[in-house]
């Protein structure tokens, strides 16, 4: 692995120093990103960092709501990765970005499709054709939430 991308919140972790030491040993570059960053990967591939705001972390449920949200773009295709953000972060993202900036072909649904994520307004802004939800079968949390699934289905979104 050549590079690892994290937000500044990673520095909060008690394991951060150990993490840094492993990266140095492996000669892996650590890239700390902030909202508004643009990473050119190849000619037609780039990543836009949508969130977090490293200068103003959300204090509520800090690890989830300050997850990296990034949009990976390749020519006319895009995918929005939302980490574990919840409604509070979604609302901040909606305030700061146009729907065009958030629109993506594929949405990696935030926080495993929990009831605390994927508001109607956020899903409508992203307007995905496909939604991917990372969950374990018969998990103890009841993810994904039925309301989240219904909101995605109303947009005729294929769910995986």
Residue ranges of predicted features:
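Non-globular, low-confidence helical/coil segments that flank catalytic cores
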Residues: 1-160
């Amino acid at each position: 692995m050549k590079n690892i991308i994290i937000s500044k919140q990673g520095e909060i972790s008690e394991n951060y120093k150990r993490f840094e030491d492993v990266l140095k040993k492996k000669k892996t570059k650590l890239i700390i990103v902030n909202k508004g960053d643009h990473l050119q990967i190849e000619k037609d591939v780039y990543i836009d960092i949508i969130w977090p705001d490293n200068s103003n972390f959300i204090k509520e449920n800090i690890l989830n709501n300050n997850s990296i949200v990034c949009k990976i773009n390749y020519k006319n295709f895009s995918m929005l990765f939302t980490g574990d953000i919840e409604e509070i972060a979604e609302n901040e993202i909606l305030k700061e970005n146009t729907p065009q900036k958030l629109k993506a072909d594929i949405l990696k649904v935030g926080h495993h499709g929990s009831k605390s994520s994927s508001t109607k307004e956020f899903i409508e802004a992203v307007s995905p054709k496909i939604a991917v939800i990372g969950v374990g079968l018969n998990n103890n949390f009841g993810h994904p939430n039925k309301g989240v699934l219904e909101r995605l289905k109303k947009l005729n979104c294929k769910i995986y």
